[in-house]
A protein has these predicted regions:
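Mid-sequence acidic-hydrophobic segments that form the walls
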Residues: 11, 15-18, 97, 104, ...
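Amphipathic, membrane-active segments
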Residues: 16-70
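C-terminal amphipathic alpha-helix
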Residues: 105-135
Length: 135
């Protein structure tokens, strides 16, 4: 269950590593990718903040699933269909953020798991900003 945070971070790191490739795409595709990456970042930030405050991030599961389902359609031209599906599946495997919140709250490693979520959020946000402007 706690591999969820690692999966999310792995997706963010992989996509961030493709920054040059992603920002080379045409403007509308970059805008679509940036919007999705920013939405993912916002979801992760809200999830982490909720967990840190001792709350269960209700509704974030459905939100993250929606983004995971949209991801392959947004990045497949840049990474290939198989890899796009794999990344979408990895993000989708993290759907149980409400259960994650309950597990993390009881964990002695709570801060390290939250740090992974926050790092992933930061990478998604930075990538969104970089590809939006083509930098």
């Amino acid at each position: 269950m706690l591999d969820i945070t690692k999966n999310i971070l792995d997706v963010a790191r992989f996509l961030f590593g493709l920054n040059d490739q992603l920002k080379a795409t045409e403007r509308q595709r970059r805008a679509d990718m940036a919007a999705l990456f920013e939405d993912i970042s916002n979801c992760l930030t809200a999830t982490s903040g909720g967990i840190r405050a001792g709350a269960i991030p209700h509704g974030r599961c459905a939100e993250l699933i929606t983004y995971a389902q949209a991801l392959p359609g947004v990045i497949y031209q840049e990474v290939g269909e198989a890899r796009a599906r794999e990344l979408g599946d990895m993000l989708h495997s993290a759907y149980a953020v409400e259960q994650l919140a309950m597990r993390i709250a009881q964990s002695t490693d709570k801060e390290s798991y939250l740090a992974q979520l926050e790092e992933a959020s930061g990478k998604f946000r930075a990538l969104a900003n970089l590809i939006r402007v083509g930098l």
